[in-house]
Amino acid sequence: MSYAIFKHGGKQYKVVEGDIVLLDKMNKEPKALVELVEVLAVSKEGKLSCGKPFVNGAKIEVEVINEGRAKKVITFKKRRRKDSKTKRGFRRDFTRVRITKIVA
């Protein structure tokens, strides 16, 4: 089983071909093909190649499925005896992609 570890938006993801992953918003149209080149490690046929920091010549080809927004996350802070409270909401924008090919 071959897999790859790549970096996108300050996070690292471990994927195999055919996986569906939620990445940070990329502003691409659905069915667009995108290449991700910040590949940290690739394992093919049991051989692991790690980069310093990235693997030379490695890339991951992905197909954009859609874009959307996640459910709202509420943060609530209350300071006791101070009659003070704060309520905030945050919705993450994401791009759903399918891993089509891992090139190493």
UniProtKB/Swiss-Prot annotation:
GO terms for cellular component: cytoplasm; ribonucleoprotein complex; ribosome. Pfam families: Ribosomal_L21p. Keywords: Ribonucleoprotein, Ribosomal protein, RNA-binding, rRNA-binding. One of its GO terms (molecular function) is structural constituent of ribosome. The keyword GTP-binding does not apply. Transmembrane segments: none annotated. Part of the 50S ribosomal subunit. Contacts protein L20. This protein binds to 23S rRNA in the presence of protein L20. Belongs to the bacterial ribosomal protein bL21 family. HAMAP family: Ribosomal_bL21 (MF_01363). This is Large ribosomal subunit protein bL21. The lineage of its organism: Bacteria, Pseudomonadati, Campylobacterota, Epsilonproteobacteria, Campylobacterales.
